[in-house]
Amino acid sequence: MLPSLQESLDGDEKELESSEEGGSAEERRLEPPPSSHYCLYSFRGSRLTQNRGDSDDGRSGGINAETPSGDDFSLSLVDTNLPSEVEPELRSFIAKRLSKGAVFEGLGNVASVELRIPGYRVGCYYCLFQQEKLLPEIAAMESEHNPSEYVVCFLGGSEKGLELFRLELDKYIQGLKNNMNCEERSLGNDVKSYLNSWYEDVVCPIQRVVLLFQEKLTFLLHAALSYTPVEFKESDEKTKRDINRFLSVASLQGLIHEGTMTSLCMAMTEEQHKSVIIDCSGPQPQFHNAGSNRFCEDWMQAFLHGAEAGNPFLFRQVLENFKLKAIQDTNNLKRFIRQAEMNHYALFKCYMFLKNCGSGDILLKIVKVEHEEMPEAKSVVAVLEEFMREALV
């Protein structure tokens, strides 16, 4: 296994468990059951005053969130699956956050909330959003001059765990807005089902993919790392959606130069095996044209180790560590290549690094694309390619 991989995994598992337990012995005694909840509130307040001038200290002004008070502020429950004795505590927590003016439309926040009954700390994602089309029961309460605003809260896991999914939850809110725009009468079953499914739709896909593929997960990791296109045969929509979500999170998109990513995708598509085929027609999915390497095999074992804990948030943390290690190895190889342009010993270090890192096949393709327009580095990459081919003979 790669150096420090097991230590990294164990550390993340303990940290996630510690954050969910709350840290102290008293908080660990009040550990939450494995459940998730939601709350949807309508919000009316004087917090959308635009200030486009400059502030006193010379900085450009943005949204000036005034502190709501009295008749200018209301937070009304629209729908929830929280126990009735707990919801007022959550509402009080959200009201305090709104009053501080640190909540911006469409950008979610994650915090840890301690609920007195049944008595545990839980991660809470909350997001303010505007709705173009009012639900009838809300429209009667709203002023003509005040746009309808809602606050949605998702509760589950820990603050650290939910933070890993904050961007996905922001996108999920956009889907909620679209569903609510389609409602003609009161809050319909589609919206309630959407709210109730947030945990399964956002948090659990990575876990489902790991449990589905087991040891074959190495092929999916390799495809994500190498930007190899993936096609499906006789797969249901939910499985396809889960796999695509996994590939999206596992790829290095956004972590390496966009031009490099585009060129690498084109290079991989032009190779003999254009796409990895996942055949779901049988009882177990089968891969065709799939590749693997020692790096992906080692990280596959890390995912299987995480499966024993049964914590869906842990899989996302392992996936983030997988990408971090890949980026670190890529940057190390680039540094060695720069040194090798003037130093033959550094060239040998490049070769030994590629041979031992476990993902030399992919790293070499990444740096080859990046150094295509740099003659000296390009010649170093060509020598390394020859060394690697000879090593395979």
From Swiss-Prot:
Biased composition (Acidic residues): 9-24
Any Gene Ontology biological process: intracellular protein transport
Phosphoserine PTM positions: S8, S18
Entry keywords, A to Z: Phosphoprotein
InterPro entries named among the record's database cross-references: Njmu-R1 (IPR028280)
Keyword hit for Kinase: no
Annotated region described as Disordered, given as residue ranges: 1-74
GO-annotated cellular components: cytoplasmic vesicle; cytosol; trans-Golgi network
Subunit and interaction comment: Interacts with TBC1D23; this interaction may be indirect.
Function summary: May have a role in spermatogenesis.
Protein name per its UniProtKB record: Protein Njmu-R1
